[in-house]
C-alpha cells in the first residue's frame, strides 16, 4: 500500500469525518481517480508529436495512455473525424496515490517561482483540475530527448459533494494551495 493511501486511511479520513460530522464512513470524501490529458492539435500535421506524447505520458503515469480521436470534423482546423488529437491516461488505486505523492513532493516544487496552486480550480462537485505548462518538470522526462515542450491537464476526481470538502481533502493530503 502506498504511503499516501496509508496517510489517508489513518489520519485524513478520521479528521474529515470529525470536521464535517459524517455519520457513515462511506460519506467521507476520497480520491476516485486521476486523469492525465494532453491535447495535441499539432498532431494533425505531424504524427511524430503524437508518438512523443505517448512515450512521455507513459513515463509520467507509469501506464500506456489511450490515443483520443476527434469526434467531429472541423474544416477550419483541417480536422477529420477519427483523427488522433490527444492522449489520456486514467490512474486508479495505488498508481493514483503514488502519482499524487510524486506530484506534491517532487514535481510541483520543481516549478519555477512556485507559490502554490490555485484554490479556485474546482468544478463545483469537489473535483480539481491542474494545468501544467511544460512536461519537463516531471523527473522522468529527459530534457535532451524531448522534441517539443507540451503541457498537460491533471484532473483529480474525488467523491466529495462540494468544493469545500474536496479542497479540505486535498489540503490534508498535502496539496500546496496558494493562500
Curated annotation (Swiss-Prot):
GO molecular function annotations of the record: rRNA binding; structural constituent of ribosome; tRNA binding
Keyword Ribonucleoprotein attached: yes
UniProt record, GO biological process: translation
PROSITE patterns (UniProt xref): RIBOSOMAL_L5
A single cellular component GO annotation: ribosome
Protein's UniProt keywords contain Thylakoid: no
InterPro entries found in the cross-reference section: Ribosomal_uL5 (IPR002132), Ribosomal_uL5_bac-type (IPR020930), Ribosomal_uL5_C (IPR031309), Ribosomal_uL5_CS (IPR020929), Ribosomal_uL5_dom_sf (IPR022803), Ribosomal_uL5_N (IPR031310)
Domain of life of the organism encoding this protein: Bacteria
Assigned keywords, A-Z: Ribonucleoprotein, Ribosomal protein, RNA-binding, rRNA-binding, tRNA-binding
Gene3D superfamilies: 3.30.1440.10
PANTHER family linked: 60S RIBOSOMAL PROTEIN L11-RELATED
Similarity annotation: Belongs to the universal ribosomal protein uL5 family.
Function, as annotated: This is one of the proteins that bind and probably mediate the attachment of the 5S RNA into the large ribosomal subunit, where it forms part of the central protuberance. In the 70S ribosome it contacts protein S13 of the 30S subunit (bridge B1b), connecting the 2 subunits; this bridge is implicated in subunit movement. Contacts the P site tRNA; the 5S rRNA and some of its associated proteins might help stabilize positioning of ribosome-bound tRNAs.
Subunit structure, as described in the record: Part of the 50S ribosomal subunit; part of the 5S rRNA/L5/L18/L25 subcomplex. Contacts the 5S rRNA and the P site tRNA. Forms a bridge to the 30S subunit in the 70S ribosome.
Protein name: Large ribosomal subunit protein uL5
Amino acid at each position: 500500500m502506498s504511503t499516501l493511501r496509508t496517510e489517508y486511511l489513518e489520519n485524513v479520513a478520521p479528521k474529515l469525518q470529525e470536521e464535517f460530522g459524517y455519520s457513515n464512513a462511506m460519506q467521507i470524501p476520497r480520491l476516485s481517480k486521476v486523469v492525465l490529458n494532453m491535447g495535441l492539435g499539432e498532431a494533425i500535421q505531424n504524427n511524430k508529436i503524437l508518438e512523443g506524447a505517448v512515450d512521455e505520458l507513459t513515463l509520467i503515469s507509469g501506464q500506456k495512455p489511450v490515443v483520443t480521436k476527434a469526434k467531429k470534423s472541423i474544416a477550419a482546423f483541417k480536422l477529420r473525424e477519427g483523427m488522433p488529437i490527444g492522449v489520456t491516461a486514467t490512474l486508479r488505486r495505488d498508481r493514483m496515490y503514488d502519482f499524487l505523492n510524486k506530484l506534491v513532493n517532487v514535481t510541483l516544487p520543481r516549478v519555477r517561482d512556485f507559490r502554490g496552486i490555485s484554490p479556485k480550480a474546482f468544478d463545483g462537485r469537489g473535483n480539481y483540475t491542474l494545468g501544467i505548462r511544460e512536461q519537463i518538470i516531471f523527473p522522468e522526462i529527459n530534457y535532451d530527448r524531448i522534441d517539443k515542450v507540451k503541457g498537460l491537464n491533471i484532473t483529480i476526481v474525488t467523491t466529495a459533494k462540494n468544493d469545500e470538502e474536496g479542497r479540505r481533502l486535498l489540503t490534508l493530503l498535502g496539496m500546496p494551495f496558494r493562500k
